[in-house]
From Swiss-Prot:
GO biological process: protein transport by the Tat complex
Gene name linked to the record: tatA
Keywords from the UniProt entry: Cell inner membrane, Cell membrane, Membrane, Protein transport, Translocation, Transmembrane, Transmembrane helix, Transport
Topological relation to the membrane, as annotated: Single-pass membrane protein
Species the sequence originates in: Methylorubrum populi (strain ATCC BAA-705 / NCIMB 13946 / BJ001)
Annotated region (Disordered), positions in chain: 42-91
InterPro entries: TatA/B/E (IPR003369), TatA/E (IPR006312)
Its job: Part of the twin-arginine translocation (Tat) system that transports large folded proteins containing a characteristic twin-arginine motif in their signal peptide across membranes. TatA could form the protein-conducting channel of the Tat system.
Compartments reported by the entry: Cell inner membrane
Subunit structure: The Tat system comprises two distinct complexes: a TatABC complex, containing multiple copies of TatA, TatB and TatC subunits, and a separate TatA complex, containing only TatA subunits. Substrates initially bind to the TatABC complex, which probably triggers association of the separate TatA complex to form the active translocon.
Record carries keyword Chaperone: no
GO molecular function: protein transmembrane transporter activity
Family note: Belongs to the TatA/E family.
Disulfide bonds listed in the record: none
Name of this protein: Sec-independent protein translocase protein TatA
Amino acid sequence: MGSMSVWHWVIVAVVVMLLFGRGKVSELMGDVAKGIKAFKKGMADDETQPTNTTSVPPVGPNDPVRTLPHQGAPGTAPQQTHVPAGDHKAV
């Protein structure tokens, strides 16, 4: 009962053919094939396009580290402020 035999699949195929008819099934399979072809074409187009389209030059191993104004120097921890235990507010 756990595995499906060939006869189960034949019966399922016959029921599908009766419900949808020969024209609908072939039309559906054609649409699936067109979708697969379009997907493959899209994947091939992505491979031919250059991946680096930004104008920012890549950072080399000897370039200095750039920091934003609100950041500290690299390797320093931000200042921690102490809040007394009774002053916490629920959000």
